[in-house]
UniProtKB/Swiss-Prot annotation:
Entry annotated with the keyword Membrane: yes
Pathway: Steroid metabolism; ergosterol biosynthesis; ergosterol from zymosterol: step 3/5
Lineage of origin: Eukaryota, Fungi, Dikarya, Ascomycota, Saccharomycotina
UniProt-reported outcome of changing residue 353 to T: In strain: azole-resistant isolates
Comment block on domains: The histidine box domains may contain the active site and/or be involved in metal ion binding.
Gene field: ERG3
Name of this chain's protein: Delta(7)-sterol 5(6)-desaturase
One MF term in the entry's GO annotations: delta7-sterol 5(6)-desaturase activity
Length: 386
């Protein structure tokens, strides 16, 4: 995110923060006592890990024995451990990397590297970008791809699209807020994100290899998180709002409970904390993920690929609840015995109206059986056909 944040700081935020939060301005004077009090807090020091005497302070290299623990040194040890993972050259805001310094770079008491400024900037940028990406991609899919015959499906809801949009637009800012800590870790050097492409970083071959690694890692993570979200106690609280949509439009793609959306995004944020990932590819993959999320909700069935977890597979998940939890592939569903092959009827084009009604009626019958098992007898949805 440092690339995006520096672009925004250079073209907009440096001046905005200088105007709204100037040094020695009213806000600064008001906050000075709190800032001074905060700066006087005696935080644990960050000792050099290489010189840390683990034998005499916290833990023996061979044993963990309570007699070896000195409680006073635990905070210092933990802080030093955390600090050892930090790449200080990647800390954002200490010096410009991609653009020259602006005239306003040092005129706000909230410097570029200030964690409160980073949090506010990230929230604004990511929320606006999330809304734009959601509306643009979902709208284009709705206009050019989405099969609007789905409006006649007996399990399409009253005012469904407006409900989907309302749910998504209110969820996105909360999902952003929940994921900001991961962006802050990246901005402060606690990730394996990098920019230079050379022999030391593996060159372009490494970048090409990162794409399938990212897909496979996140596909695995989302599968298990998604299955957990279908545990009855968790489903009722978090995941049921997304299953309100039995048949979907592209606008259902981000219509989650925000905590549900946060959990399903965790693998995307964990990957760069664990594995090397090029910064530009990182931005591309996050954009791709949003495209994919819209695509699997667009109701257009182009392929019945046995490997790719496409639109048809995800339609089966919304119709029949307990199948096809994967995001990109069918691998983990096959291994976890939760794969359900999409019905051939989904791929038949130019179906006559009467035949389509029979197909939908059979879908509804099967769906109601499983829905009753998952949610109970009471269905609080309001369908068009009621």
């Amino acid at each position: 995110m440092d690339i995006v944040l520096e672009i925004c700081d250079y073209y907009l935020f440096d001046k905005v923060y200088a105007d709204v939060f100037p040094k020695d301005g009213a806000v600064h004077e008001f906050l000075k006592p709190a800032i001074q009090s905060f700066s006087q807090i005696d935080f644990p020091s960050l000792p050099n890990l290489d010189s840390f005497d683990t034998n005499s302070t916290l833990i023996s290299s061979n044993n963990f024995n309570i007699s070896n623990v000195n409680p006073a040194t635990i905070p210092s040890y933990l802080f030093s451990k955390i600090a050892s993972y930090q790449d200080k050259s990647e800390i954002y805001g200490l010096a410009p990397k991609f653009f020259p310094a602006t005239d306003f770079i040092n005129t706000s008491f909230l410097a570029r590297s200030n964690i409160f400024r980073e949090t506010l900037s990230l929230f604004i940028i990511t929320t606006i970008f999330g809304w734009l990406l959601y509306f643009i991609v979902a709208y284009l899919s709705y206009v050019f791809v989405f099969d609007k015959k789905i409006f006649n499906h007996p399990r399409y809801l009253k005012n469904q699209m407006s409900l989907e949009i309302k749910r998504a637009t209110t969820a996105i800012p909360v999902m952003v807020l929940l994921t900001i800590p991961f962006f802050l870790l990246e901005l402060n050097g606690y990730s394996f994100l990098y920019l230079d492409i050379n022999e030391c970083t593996g060159g372009y071959k490494a970048i090409l290899w990162q794409i399938p690694k990212f897909i496979l890692f996140t596909d695995c993570g989302i599968y298990f998180l998604h299955r957990w979200l279908h545990w009855p106690s968790v489903y009722k609280v978090l995941h049921k709002p997304h299953h309100k949509w039995i048949v979907c439009t592209p606008f259902a793609s981000h219509a989650f409970h925000p905590v549900d959306g946060f959990f399903q995004s965790l693998p995307y944020h964990l990957y760069p904390l664990l594995f090397p990932l090029h910064k530009v590819l990182y931005l591309f993959l996050f954009t791709f993920v949003n495209f994919w999320t819209v695509m699997i909700h667009d109701g257009s069935y182009w392929s019945n690929d046995p490997v790719v977890n496409g639109t048809a597979c995800h339609t089966v998940h919304h119709l029949y609840f307990n199948y096809n939890y994967g995001q990109f592939t069918t691998l983990w569903d096959r291994l976890g015995n939760s794969y359900r092959r999409p019905d051939d009827s989904l791929f038949v084009k130019d179906v006559k109206a009467e035949e389509e009604k029979k197909i939908w009626k059979e879908q509804t019958r099967k769906m109601e059986e499983i829905r009753g098992e998952v949610e109970g007898k009471v269905d609080d949805r309001e369908y068009v056909e009621q």
